[in-house]
Amino acid sequence: MFVHAHPDDEVISTGIALASYAAAPDTSVTLVTCTLGEEGEVLVPELINLRADRGDQLGGYRIGELAGSCAALGITDQRFLGGPGRWRDSGMIGTPANDHPRSLWRADLAEATAELVRIVRDVRPHVLVSYDSNGGYGHPDHIRAHQVTARAFTDAADPAFAPGTGEPWQVAKRYETAMPRSRAVAGFELFHDSADRNNPFAGLKSVDDLAMTLVDDADITAEISAPEFFDAKIAAMRAHRTQMAVDGFFFALADGIGQRAWGVEHFVLAAGTRGPGDGPDGRERDLLAGVAF
C-alpha cells in the first residue's frame, strides 16, 4: 500500500514500484491519495481558470488525471483518504492555504490516522510506503502523509484504536521514499544551469542547497529496478498534464538521465525487519523480501 499526498506524487517517486507490483501475478497494490491537489499549478494555458485563486476547480480535474496515471501504471485500487475532498491540499509551507479549515495540514492527526487504519484493515497489506519525516522536501501534506502512515503502521494492529474500522492488522514493514545523494549529484551536474522554473537544481551552487532530503547511498535499504516499466512511468507522468509540461524539467530529466533517473526507485526501511537483498550495499530488490505470507 502506497500513501501519497497529491495526484502525481504516486508516479514521481514510486511509479516503477507501483507498476511492477501491479503487474506481478501474486501481488496486489493499493494507492491512497490524501488530497485532490487543489493548490497545484496549472501549466496548461487553456485550463488556467481551474486554479485555486480563480475558479478553484483543479481538484476535480486532477481526479481525472490521477485515473489516467493509474491506468498507465496498472493500478486498479485507488482510494482517497477519508473519501474524495475530505482533506484539501495545504499548499506550500507558509502560504494562506495552510490555514484552510479542510487543509490536510490542519487535520486532526487521530482522525486522519483512523481513516488510513480503516483502509489498512480492509486491504490488509504487508507493506506500507510513504515519505520521510520531512515529507521529502518539506511540503506540509507530505509531512502529514508521513505522520499518518507512521501512526497507522502501529495503530492498525491495536484493537483499542478506532473500533468499528475493521479487525486489527499488523503490517510487516514500512518504507520511506528516498533520494540517493548520487542521483541528486547527477541531476545537479546536468541541470543546474537550466532556467526551467520547475527545475529544483536551477540557480543552486551546490547539491546540498536542494530543499529535498538527500540520503547517503549506503543508507538506502531497498531499490526497485524494473526498466520494462519505464515507458509506463512516463505515460503516467504525461497523464498529469496540468502539473508536468511535456517540454519541462521532468521530461528533460527523463531524456537526460533516462532510466537512471526514472527507471530505478529507492527506499529506506523505517519499521519492520529487513529482508535479504543482493543489490548494492546489500539492498533489497523487493519490498516484500523476508515477509512471511
UniProtKB/Swiss-Prot annotation:
Record EC number: 3.5.1.103
Cofactor(s) listed: Zn(2+)
GO MF: N-acetylglucosaminylinositol deacetylase activity; zinc ion binding
A Pfam family it matches: PIG-L
UniProtKB keywords: Hydrolase, Metal-binding, Zinc
Catalytic activity: 1D-myo-inositol 2-acetamido-2-deoxy-alpha-D-glucopyranoside + H2O = 1D-myo-inositol 2-amino-2-deoxy-alpha-D-glucopyranoside + acetate
Binding site for Zn(2+): H6, D9, H142
InterPro entries, per database record: GlcNAc_PI_deacetylase-related, LmbE-like_dom_sf, Mycothiol_biosynthesis_MshB
GO BP terms, alphabetized: mycothiol biosynthetic process
EC class of the enzyme, as a word: hydrolase
Cofactor, free-text remark: Binds 1 zinc ion per subunit.
UniProt xrefs under SUPFAM superfamilies: LmbE-like (SSF102588)
Function statement: Catalyzes the deacetylation of 1D-myo-inositol 2-acetamido-2-deoxy-alpha-D-glucopyranoside (GlcNAc-Ins) in the mycothiol biosynthesis pathway.
Protein family per UniProt: Belongs to the MshB deacetylase family.
Protein name per UniProt: 1D-myo-inositol 2-acetamido-2-deoxy-alpha-D-glucopyranoside deacetylase 2
Taxonomy of the source species: Bacteria, Bacillati, Actinomycetota, Actinomycetes, Frankiales
